[in-house]
Amino acid sequence: MMLTGSHGTFCSGVALTRSLVLTAAHCVLPGADYKLVEFDSARQPLLKDVATITRHPGFDVNAVLRHRVTADVALIKLGAPLMVLPARLAPEGVAVTAGDPFVVAGYGVAVRGDGKTGGVVRAARLVATGQPGTLQIRLADPAGKGERAGLGACTGDSGAPVYREVGGTLAVIGVVSWSTGPALSEGCGGLTGVTPLMRYRAWIVEQAAKLGSPLPP
């Protein structure tokens, strides 16, 4: 899913039910109006009204700016159902180790600073690097390992789902929070910072039920 804000920003997200979208909390800050963008079979955009936005109470926007750990998770309740097939939330207890493969899918730009390249869903296969855990996961293109330019999240990919194969199918294990250029420079194509959902899964399930969009067991 693609999310647009009245301040001119855009992010990505993923439908957990036909009326509930998961994204990054920093994508839906107070002080702006937001719309979900769904594309029909002819690739024509359809704007969906947002009914409510629920950010995790532990979210700290300053932590995201510093690439630090925070509860960068939010749920968007829509005013009308989507046409898409919802994604599956990864179950509890999925371990992550360095080298594990992931798939990131978002609507971000292909070239930093070129907004015209955004708005098209793209997927990248990345691997966990460093010391991944329940607080933060850092992904990199296995070819460049974060030191050379490669695949990764860019502007507009914040909030995008991060998938991991669980039981033979892909499940959402995290959302994109930030990105860097090669060797921790500014930009894209280096590291992709992910907020894993393990610590926030219970909150997501609880809030989904309160919002009238319970997740499947």
Regions found by a protein language model. Name each.
Residues 34-84, 89-94, 116:
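Conserved catalytic-core segment of clan PA serine endopeptidases
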Residues 1-8, 12:
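N-terminal activation segment of mature serine protease catalytic domains
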Residues 15, 29, 45-47, 66-70, ...:
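Extracellular/periplasmic catalytic domains that process cell-envelope and extracellular macromolecules
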Residues 20, 32, 100, 157-160:
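Surface-exposed loop/turn positions
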Residues 70-73, 78-150, 190, 197-202:
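Chymotrypsin/trypsin-fold serine protease catalytic domain
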